[in-house]
């Protein structure tokens, strides 16, 4: 007869792992923040006019205005999420950018973001990406909005400072 180790049946829900739970937002913040900043930076470095032309081609109204709005949301919102500042405030416009990308660009290509079409001497050849990564970013933003930014964040430091001030009173 096999005995079950009670510690294993509880998994990570034991007190010794509880101290690690507070760190769960950190990788979400870092990848979402960095990802958004990287996309915004790429649009700037490759010439915003190319992005505006794409927006015009897919029928986005006021493509230059919407292009700059997108770039600013990606750069500023990405940085805010990366450092854990005003995450709830920036999550809404960031989610809007993702939803627009899903419905105007990625939806016709299905879910998968990686579509291997061929492997040639030049390397792997991929098709257009689907909406998978956008949905992952939305899930990460939702987790951060519903939870908190974590201890290594501007919001975490402000909360810690505020609680110390209250204790001193």
Feature locations, PLM:
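Membrane-interface interhelical connector segments
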Residues: 45-65
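Extended, low-polarity transmembrane helix blocks
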Residues: 1-45, 64-72, 76-79, 83-169
